[in-house]
Amino acid sequence: MTPFLLVLSSPSGGGKTTIARSLLQARTDVGYSVSATTRPPRPGERDGHDYHFLTGAEFERRVVAGEFLEHATYGGHRYGTLRAEIDRVLGNGCHAVLDIEVEGARQVMDRMPDAVRVFVLPPSAKVLVERLRSRDTETPATRRVRLARAAEELLA
């Protein structure tokens, strides 16, 4: 089978990363595209494995240089997919998996209409709230912003 791009998208806390990790563990012909972000690492996250952690200036330099397939601001931080990451995975003969937020997925589909997009619905609003709370990585104000954005994305 010809390698393809699989785009998993959902609101923050929707379950896309959990699904991506399960897929990567179950299949040897799937590779993960590591996203870039300006947010600080969460406990246990590693640069180049979970994300490419960039400064705001470095992120902007790469945007201007056209290195991103997609990028967006979410929860006060910038996130994006480096074209080189997709090329790396597909070039190794593997299917590439992205787990990205909803606006980024729209941008990818505009630029790569042959990609397969899966929108991941959280089981319920209550579960989504609990997932974000259990992360314990955000302030209540930031969590409210993420939940408001999630509501918009789920209604879109």
Regions found by a protein language model. Name each.
Residues T2-L6:
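Pre-Walker A (Motif I) flank of P-loop NTPase domains
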Residues S9-P11:
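P-loop (Walker A) phosphate-binding loop of NTP-binding proteins
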Residues G14:
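ATP-binding Walker
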Residues T17:
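Walker A/P-loop
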Residues A20-R21:
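The feature captures the helix immediately C-terminal to the Walker
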Residues Q25-S33:
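Post-Walker A helix-loop "phosphate-sensing" segment adjacent to the P-loop in P-loop NTPases
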Residues S35-A96, V102-E103:
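ATP-dependent small-molecule kinase phosphotransfer cores
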Residues R39-R46, E67-L69, L90-H95, V102, ...:
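A glycine- and Lys/Arg-enriched "phosphate-lid" helix/loop adjacent to the NTP-binding pocket
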